[in-house]
From Swiss-Prot:
Its EC number is 3.1.3.5. It holds the Pfam family SurE. It is an enzyme of class 3 (hydrolase). This is 5'-nucleotidase SurE 2. Keywords: Cytoplasm, Hydrolase, Metal-binding, Nucleotide-binding, Plasmid. It comes from Thermus thermophilus (strain ATCC BAA-163 / DSM 7039 / HB27). Nucleotidase that shows phosphatase activity on nucleoside 5'-monophosphates.
Length: 244
C-alpha cells in the first residue's frame, strides 16, 4: 500500500511525523506538507501563482520518508504530492495540533487535505488531537493511531473519515458530526504604533449531544466520523421539487 501523509500545521510539526511513522506500519509512506503553518485555510487551492516544492532533508534521528515541503495549502500538498510521488492508495492528514470537531471541519485545512484526496477517488482520513494546555504525547498516542488505522482499513473503499483523539484515550467510538453553535467574539487591540488590530475568537453555546464527535472526545474516546461531500439537503429538496 502506498500512503501520502500531509497536514496543515506544516512540515516541522511533530504530529505529521507521528502519523507518518504509524502509517509506515501499513505501507510505503510519502510526505508532502506545507512549508509554513496553514491552519484554518480550509479547502483553498493556489491559482494566482505557481506552487513550489523542495525536497525535505532527512532528520538526524528517527525514520525518514521521501518528503517535500510545499509552498502552498494543504489541498495543494495533496494534489502536488500525487504528481511528485505517483499514485497512492490512501491519503492521511494530521495529526493536527488542535481538535477538528463539529463545524470546525468547515475551515479545517487538515480535513480539507483529506477531502482533496477523496475528491481524487482515494480513501482518506484526517487526524486531530486537542490542545488543552499540554503537549500531546505522540508516543503514548501511537497505539491508538495504529488501532484506528487498522479499523479504517477494514472499511469499504473509498472512505472519508474525520478522526479526533483525546490526549489520553480510553476507547474508540464511531460518531456523528456535532452541530456546534458558536458565539462569535472580536477582541480588539492596539500595536505599539497605535494601529488597531483584532483577534477573532468564539465560545460554544451548546453542550455536545451524546454520540457526537465532541461528546466522544470529552468522554475520553477516539472519535471517528464518516463524512460525505454531497451537501444536498434532501429534506428541503423534495418539498421544493413538489412545488414545481
Amino acid at each position: 500500500m502506498r500512503i501520502l501523509v500531509t497536514n496543515d500545521d506544516g512540515i516541522y510539526s511533530p504530529g505529521l511525523w507521528a502519523l507518518a511513522e504509524a502509517a509506515s506500519q501499513f505501507g510505503e509512506v510519502f510526505v508532502a506538507a506545507p512549508d509554513t503553518e496553514q491552519s484554518a485555510t480550509g479547502h483553498a487551492i493556489t491559482i494566482a501563482h505557481p506552487v513550489r516544492a523542495y525536497p525535505h532533508p532527512a532528520p538526524l534521528h528517527g525514520p525518514h520518508f521521501p518528503a517535500y515541503q510545499v509552498r502552498g495549502t494543504p489541498a495543494d500538498c495533496v494534489a502536488l504530492g500525487l504528481h511528485l510521488f505517483g499514485p497512492v492508495d490512501l491519503v492521511l492528514s494530521g495529526v493536527n495540533l488542535g481538535s477538528n470537531l463539529g463545524h470546525e471541519i468547515w475551515h479545517s485545512g487538515t480535513v480539507a487535505a483529506a477531502k482533496q484526496g477523496y475528491l481524487f477517488g482515494l480513501s482518506a482520513a484526517a487526524f486531530s488531537v486537542p490542545l488543552n494546555g499540554e503537549v500531546p504525547d505522540f508516543a503514548g498516542l501511537r497505539p491508538w493511531l495504529l488501532r484506528t488505522l487498522e479499523t479504517l482499513l477494514r472499511l469499504e473503499r473509498p472512505f472519508l473519515v474525520n478522526v479526533n483523539l483525546p490526549l489520553r484515550p480510553k476507547g474508540f467510538l464511531w460518531t456523528r458530526q456535532s452541530v456546534r453553535a458558536y458565539e462569535g467574539v472580536v477582541i480588539p487591540g492596539e500595536d505599539p504604533m497605535g494601529r488597531p488590530f483584532y483577534w477573532f475568537a468564539s465560545r460554544p453555546l451548546k453542550e455536545a449531544e451524546e454520540g457526537t464527535d465532541r461528546w466522544a472526545v470529552a468522554q475520553g474516546f477516539v472519535s471517528a466520523t464518516p463524512l460525505r461531500l454531497d451537501l444536498t439537503d434532501e429534506t428541503r429538496l423534495q418539498p421544493a421539487l413538489a412545488q414545481e
